[in-house]
């Protein structure tokens, strides 16, 4: 989801180095040092305005969270939420999801979240989808053996594509929700996008898969 350019976004990020890691390549292999503890590390690729990552951090203080987004303005809004919530277990990165191995050692990340990723519906753009096999190669490297990905979307086409992509890659589809908000699942933390469109009756799909 594209967001209008925000004036002062770059300065906002630069002025908060405690939360925004400006040179994440220097943290590769030492993220536990960055957080100052050895708690599990969960990352969200495409963190948007930060509602999910902040909500998860508040709910699970014993887990370290890293929100990743390439859009400058979007990440600045996520920083607003992190600052307002005063969580101590969140860091933010402005990097591309295809380059994660530049910032994380093999097996350094314990779990991944992909929420409402761009569906890139045109066939010629398949390689840009975050559940395309090349991305899965990257995720498998930075996750531990049998590492988990939790994926949510409101786009039926992307969901079906992702289920097929996970399966063809040899991943295990542990649990699938075809209408998350109509289910009895109690652990859901909503993104801003999810809250907006589910209130309009949009069905939300979810899957937990592991390598």
From Swiss-Prot:
The name on file for this protein is tRNA (guanine-N(7)-)-methyltransferase
Classification via InterPro entries: SAM-dependent_MTases_sf, tRNA_(Gua-N-7)_MeTrfase_Trmb, tRNA_methyltr_TrmB_bact
The record, for PANTHER family, names: 3-DEOXY-D-MANNO-OCTULOSONIC-ACID TRANSFERASE/TRNA GUANINE-N 7 - -METHYLTRANSFERASE (PTHR23417), PENTACOTRIPEPTIDE-REPEAT REGION OF PRORP DOMAIN-CONTAINING PROTEIN (PTHR23417:SF14)
Q: Does the keyword Isomerase apply?
A: no
* Catalytic reactions on record: guanosine(46) in tRNA + S-adenosyl-L-methionine = N(7)-methylguanosine(46) in tRNA + S-adenosyl-L-homocysteine
Give the record's family classification.
Belongs to the class I-like SAM-binding methyltransferase superfamily. TrmB family.
**Region span, Interaction with RNA:** 124-129
**What is a single molecular function from GO for this protein?**
tRNA (guanine(46)-N7)-methyltransferase activity
Alphabetized HAMAP family for the sequence: tRNA_methyltr_TrmB
SUPFAM superfamilies, alphabetically?
A: S-adenosyl-L-methionine-dependent methyltransferases
